[in-house]
């Protein structure tokens, strides 16, 4: 993860680091703990714009203060019809689409990330896996510098 953080700082547009107090307050507010990847990322930078600055930034890793349930970010309604309460929008990818963190599951101690397509949310058929961890997602974005739908290619 450290080489990814170095690259974000060197080649992209990181925000100032989150303080330990901000991280603690965030975890208290949402009721889940950051996994090891996120615990490394947020003290390094409390969000970042990847590839280019806004407007037009293809990947905006959200600051802790902007992370909300995916159903609120995508549909504007905190209701179960719009997906599980355990899904959180962590990265804005333009046009109302997000990359979503599934805090209801862990793989090797890390939360998987899924596609939070505005058009299809919360249909799991169309909103499939993006990465098994935040570090895998970040590495794919930094390596390919391509949009969400081509990360696996």
Segments predicted by a language model, with ranges:
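Compact, glycine/acidic-enriched structural inserts
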Residues: 116-138, 142
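A short alpha->loop->secondary-structure connector
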Residues: 106-110
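Broad, structure-driven detector of short, well-ordered beta-strand segments within folded domains
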Residues: 97-105
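A surface-exposed partner-binding patch
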Residues: 1-98, 149-153
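Secondary-structure boundary/capping motif
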Residues: 85-86, 115-117
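Residues in well-ordered beta-strands of folded domains
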Residues: 91, 102, 114
């Amino acid at each position: 993860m450290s080489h990814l953080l170095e690259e974000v700082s060197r080649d992209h547009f990181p925000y100032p680091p989150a303080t330990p107090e901000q991280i603690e307050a965030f975890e208290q507010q949402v009721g889940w703990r950051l996994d090891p990847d996120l615990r490394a990322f947020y003290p390094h930078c409390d969000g970042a714009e990847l590839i280019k600055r806004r407007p037009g930034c293809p990947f905006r890793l959200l600051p802790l203060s902007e992370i909300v349930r995916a159903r609120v970010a995508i549909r504007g309604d905190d209701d179960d019809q719009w997906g599980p309460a355990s899904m959180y929008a962590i990265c804005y990818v333009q046009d109302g689409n997000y990359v979503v963190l599934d805090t209801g599951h862990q793989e090797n101690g890390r939360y998987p990330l899924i596609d939070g397509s505005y058009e299809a949310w919360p249909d799991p058929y169309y909103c499939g896996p993006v990465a098994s961890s935040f570090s895998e997602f970040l590495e794919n974005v930094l390596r390919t510098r391509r949009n969400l739908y081509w990360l696996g290619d």
